[in-house]
Amino acid sequence: MDNNIKKKKFAKREYIYRKRIPYGMMNFVTVRRDDCYYVDKTSYIEEIERSNKFFFYIRPRRFGKSLTLSMLKQYYDINMADRFEELFGGLYIGENPTPEHNTYLIISLNFAVVDANLENYKKGLDAHCNTEFNYFCDVYAQYLPVDIKEEMNRKDGAAEQLDYLCKECKKTGQKVYLFIDEYDHFTNTILAEPDCLNSYQAETHGTGYLRKFFDTIKSATDSTLERVFVTGVSPVTMDDLASGFNIGTNYSLSYEFNEMAGFTEEDVREMLTYYTDTLNLHNYTVDELIELMKPWYDNYCFAKASYGETTMYNSNMVLYFIDNYIRNRGRLPENMIEENIRLDYNKLRMLIRKDKEFAHDASIIQQLVENGFVAGELKTGFPAEQIGDPDNFVSLLYYFGMVTIAGTHQGKTKFVIPNEVVREQLFRYLLDTYKENDLKYDSYEKGKLESALAYCGEWKPYFEYIADSLHKYSSQRDRQKGEYFVHGFTLAMTCDNKFYRPISEKDTQEGYADIFLCPLVDNFSDMLHSYIVELKYAKSKDTDAHVEQLRQDAIRQVIRYAESEVVTSAIKTTQLHKIIVVYKGTEMVICEEVE
């Protein structure tokens, strides 16, 4: 019996070969060596070569920029010529190589590893560049003067060392391609700590050290620096360095490069089809999986001319979902959001802090919450000291991936929150800021109320809990914001509910619903209840007759919204509850269900 048990326990599991998912991978050589699924972006090499030689490209975090940079480095590296077929065979550029492939010496810098503290920035930049410059001398020794490494190390600092290397390469007739990833890394410190602004300006203007480094890059273009490719998440630093690096071209908003980072829906469909067919995972059709993923990961647009043609999925989010879907053997991830995708906390803290500097009727965040969109001019760049300008602020939100292009409104660019991952980040942060300002609640008690809401249809205690928290927390400043604050606070609290995807101002055929608690039935198949909430606000001094009029308006509206096709299809097997809530000041005076 023991032997049988052992045989059963250690029986080899059947394995179906499939391509690995390159989740979190940024090294192109590793992706190809390990036979990972690679969405082919190599056709953009032709577009890049047709562009100006000093290429500036920014995208939000986790959009595949670093992997694209890695691919470009392997394509152009003279030392990788004998591996061209291994790395690029079967890809577009492998079948259509350009004359420039494998003809460059590569200098690769990643400012993400440099200490972002301005007090240590010069030391960190020098150390990182020195490491990379020494590596450059070692791997390309056969193409360089014999004593170049020793002489380079005698030079003082990154700028002088780079200048020396480029001049020596010119003597030997070698071309150099410079890649800089996360060039704006230390800008994060400035955004999170505005007190550092003076030090930042000193570094990026006049005789500042970073300015000197980019001046060196500019001067090297007259010698051997043939191409430069720079990536980051914000145009702020480059704008401040512009007069020092005014030969670069910003292609971040260009139509032809809209799809270079991230995945198109066609890319996602092909990937899903490959894995579902290869592994025989047919719990959901590809169409059903797309329908599930789209609200969470899609809807980015990086060029005005691309609006209405195609939208982009965040590639990291897609890979996270598919990786979990496979490992769970065809079951959906319990959490649609991977922790590492969340925006850097301090960066988002800065955004909200800057937003609070606006008057309440001009607040960008409040407009997003109340209207579902904001309108403004999309700036290609702006200096750090002008982040507080409304158009600059909404542009910064755009570059960070917090809003995306959604057409035009009254002659300006229209921006919306792109998807539920971003919405969750934004409202969770708002909830955290409330907590930091003395909002206190029992998470265990709140969790019980959320479960009762989803499984027992006990809605009144849940909304009373939100109202009680709102009343206790609200300050005089918040009371002045009135409806904006009440709506935003309610949304933030409902966004912290794992059973629902709260949709604000859901556009239905008949109009707009304040909050639709869209049930995540695919994640919680046994949940029973969903909710559509019409929220009305009266000032403290308004009459009871006015409050009653708001109540009647809410009843008519919630009935109409609940019958829309969008809502009826989303609730699936759950029972829909039509709830109206009326606040008078910060007091909830009506909370009832409409039959």
Model regions: which residues?
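Walker A/P-loop-proximal flanking segment of P-loop NTPase domains
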Residues: K6-D77, E85-G94
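Structural recognition of the conserved hydrophobic beta-strand(s) that form the central parallel beta-sheet
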Residues: F179-D181, R211-K212, E226-V233
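Nucleic-acid nuclease catalytic cores
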Residues: V547-I555, I559-E592
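Extended alpha-helical interface modules used as scaffolds for assembling large macromolecular complexes
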Residues: G248, G308-A554, R560-A562, E592-E595
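Conserved P-loop NTPase mechanochemical-coupling segment
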Residues: Y23-M26, S108-A158, F186-Q201
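Substrate-engagement module of ASCE P-loop NTPases
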Residues: Y164-K171, S199-E226
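Amphipathic alpha-helical segments of the small helical/lid subdomains adjacent to P-loop NTPase cores
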Residues: T237-G244, Y251-D323, L368
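P-loop NTPase motor core
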Residues: D40, Q74-D138
